[in-house]
Amino acid sequence: MKHFLLSVFILLLSCSQKTSLYAQPKIKVVVLAERGEIHESFVATALEWLKAYNKKSKLEYTIITNADTITSTFLADHKLFIQLNYPPYRWSDKAKAAFEDYIDNGKGAWIGFHHAALLGEFDGFAMWDWFSDFLGGIRFKNYVASRVDGEVYIEDKKHPIFHKLPSHFNLPKEEWYTFDKNPRANTHVLANVDENSYKPSTTIKMGDHPVIWTNPKKKAKNIYFLFGHHGGLFDSKEFTKLFANTIEWSIKTK
């Protein structure tokens, strides 16, 4: 009996060592973060959250703070691109071309937050037309500078990013963006904010107001979150669950 148990132990140890030797490589994720600007609170907290989240995942982050390093070769190593409030300008033509190819041809997935939709003419830069089309043909119009609470309602409850989330939830003190037109006609809207739920109330409204959407015309998996102004969002269990779900969906093979 002792010899049998010893044999079983040696066999299990051997299998464990082989599993370790042939462990799956980590999934590489590029995080383009806007640092030191008005959204620093959100970005800094997001980076800390990603670090903590990675303790139970198999991700390897490449964190960059400008678009200078973005090339087709650089992106080829990364399965997911997270745009943490970095705006769609201050990109070189080479970086733009590489990113467009990455999204158009499904070479990776994309998650964008808030400031990633600052589309228009800013800081002397022309609008990136491709990026505007990517997000539904929109142009930035206004925002709720006073920041207000808003109730977010899920529209596509079957989408994996909403797994184990309630049908609606409140996000506090957000700087809700408005655009020159509704992206709904050119994208698949996943959730909206009820402007009548704003506390305190504000006159800056869109009417039908999408806040999470995806562009199914692109081969890459992609999700845009309109919110993401301040670090306090990470105190919301619904928001952190949503972020985690979106990462997991993005890196999962179709």
Name each model-derived stretch.
Residues 1-26:
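Bacterial Sec-dependent N-terminal signal peptides
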Residues 24-27, 55-56, 65, 76, ...:
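Extracellular ligand-binding/catalytic regions of CAZymes and related secreted enzymes
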Residues 28, 109-111, 188, 221:
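Proline-centered loop/turn at the N-terminus of a beta-strand
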Residues 30-119:
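Helical hinge/lid and interdomain linker segments adjacent to catalytic or ligand-binding clefts
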Residues 36-37, 88, 117-118, 167, ...:
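Short, solvent-exposed loop/turn segments at secondary-structure junctions
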Residues 45, 49, 94, 98, ...:
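Extracytoplasmic/secreted proteins, especially bacterial periplasmic and envelope-associated proteins
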Residues 90-164:
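A glycine-rich, often tryptophan-bearing local segment used as a flexible ligand/cofactor-contacting loop or short
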Residues 143-218:
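Catalytic beta-strand/loop cores that center a nucleophilic Ser/Cys/Thr
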